[in-house]
C-alpha cells in the first residue's frame, strides 16, 4: 500500500514507492560519502539520505527513476527527512502514475466534452473549421488533455491545461453577454486556443519542466506556429481574421514584462487577458491555500509571487441566491 509523503510522521518507519527528483553526493564531517535525494510523489517531496555504502547505492539508480524505499522519518532542522536503509529501482509496471503526479480533481473526458460544447456555439464558419482541425488532431488532443497549464504558478497538474482552458471559455461566455458589440466567436476561439503552445512548452514525463523548445521559444510562439499550420490547411481563411486571432495569442499576457510581444489592442483582447489572468491567479491562490496554511492559523505562509500572506476567514453559512434578481430589487428605495 502506498504511503504518501504528506502522511509521513516523525519517527515512523516507512516503506513505499517514490520518484527520484534530485540526486547528489555529500561528505560528512568524518570524511564519509553520503547520498542526498529528493523523493517525490503527488502529495509533495521529502529529502532522503543514504549514510552507508552510498557510492554503491548511487550506482543502482538514477535521477527520474522510480524506487522502493525503506527507512525512518526523522526531524532535521525542523524538516522531515528519511534516513534510508534500503533503496532499489523498480519498473514503471509496478507503479500507478496517479500516485506520483498531481492530477486535476475533475473528470478529463467530461471537461473535454464541455469544451467541445462551448466550441459548437461558434457561428463563424472559418473559426469553427479551424477548431475542428484541432479536434481531429489525435496527437494534439492526447497532449492537450494531459498537459499541465504551468510548471508551478497555476493549474500545475496533469489535466490542468484543459481545466484552465475550459474555465476561461466559460468565463468568456458569462462575461461577454454583459457588454454589447463584442465578437463572441473570436473571443471563444481565442480562449480555447490561447495556451495551446503549452503542449510543446512543458515537459511532464517524469516531472514538470520546460522543454528545449519551451525555454527557447515559449508557448506563445509555439502556439502561433500550431495555429498557422492549421490555417494553411484552410485556403479560404480570411487574412484579417487570422491576424486578429493571432493578436489574441501574442497579447494575452497583457504586458511586455509578463512575456507578451504585444499589449492587447482590441476590446476582446483586453477582456481575454483579464479573464485569463484572473482564472490563473485564483487557481494559484486556491492551490496555495491547500498546502501552506500552518496548523491552527488562519494565515498562510508567505507567497513570494504575490509578496504577501493570505487570510483564510471562517466558513460562513452558505446563502442560497436566486437564479435571477429582478430589476426592482436592485433599485434604491
PLM regions: where:
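Short, acidic/hydrophobic/Gly-rich beta-strand patch recurrent on exposed beta strands
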Residues: 36-41, 204
Amino acid at each position: 500500500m502506498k504511503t504518501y509523503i504528506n502522511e509521513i510522521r516523525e519517527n515512523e518507519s516507512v516503506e513505499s514507492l517514490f520518484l527520484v527528483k534530485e540526486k547528489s553526493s555529500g561528505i560528512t564531517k568524518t570524511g564519509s560519502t553520503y547520498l542526498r535525494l529528493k523523493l517525490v510523489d503527488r502529495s509533495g517531496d521529502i529529502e532522503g539520505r543514504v549514510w552507508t555504502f552510498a557510492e554503491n547505492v548511487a550506482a543502482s539508480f538514477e535521477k527520474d527513476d522510480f524506487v522502493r524505499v525503506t527507512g525512518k522519518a526523522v526531524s532535521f532542522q525542523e524538516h522531515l527527512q528519511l534516513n534510508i536503509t534500503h533503496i532499489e529501482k523498480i519498473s514503471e509496471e509496478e507503479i500507478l502514475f496517479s500516485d506520483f503526479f498531481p492530477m486535476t480533481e475533475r473528470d478529463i473526458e467530461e471537461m473535454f466534452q464541455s469544451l467541445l460544447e462551448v466550441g459548437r456555439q461558434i457561428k463563424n464558419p472559418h473559426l469553427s473549421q479551424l477548431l475542428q482541425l484541432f479536434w481531429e488532431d489525435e496527437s494534439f488532443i492526447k497532449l492537450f488533455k494531459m498537459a499541465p497549464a504551468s510548471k508551478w504558478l497555476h493549474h500545475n497538474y496533469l489535466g490542468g491545461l484543459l481545466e484552465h482552458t475550459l474555465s476561461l471559455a466559460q468565463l468568456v461566455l458569462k462575461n461577454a453577454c454583459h457588454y454589447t458589440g463584442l465578437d463572441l466567436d473570436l473571443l471563444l476561439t481565442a480562449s480555447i486556443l490561447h495556451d495551446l503552445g503549452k503542449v510543446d512548452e512543458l515537459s511532464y514525463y517524469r516531472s514538470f519542466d520546460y522543454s528545449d523548445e519551451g525555454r527557447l521559444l515559449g508557448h506563445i510562439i509555439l502556439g502561433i506556429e500550431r495555429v498557422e499550420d492549421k490555417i494553411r490547411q484552410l485556403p479560404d481563411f480570411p487574412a484579417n481574421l487570422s491576424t486578429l486571432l493571432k493578436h489574441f495569442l501574442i497579447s494575452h499576457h497583457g504586458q511586455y514584462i509578463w512575456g507578451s510581444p504585444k499589449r492587447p489592442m482590441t476590446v476582446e483582447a483586453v477582456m481575454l487577458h483579464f479573464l485569463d489572468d484572473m482564472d490563473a491567479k485564483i487557481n494559484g491562490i486556491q492551490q496555495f491555500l491547500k498546502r501552506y496554511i500552518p496548523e491552527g492559523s488562519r494565515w498562510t505562509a508567505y507567497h513570494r509571487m504575490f509578496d504577501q500572506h493570505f487570510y483564510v476567514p471562517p466558513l460562513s453559512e452558505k446563502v442560497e441566491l436566486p437564479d435571477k434578481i429582478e430589476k426592482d430589487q436592485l433599485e434604491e428605495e
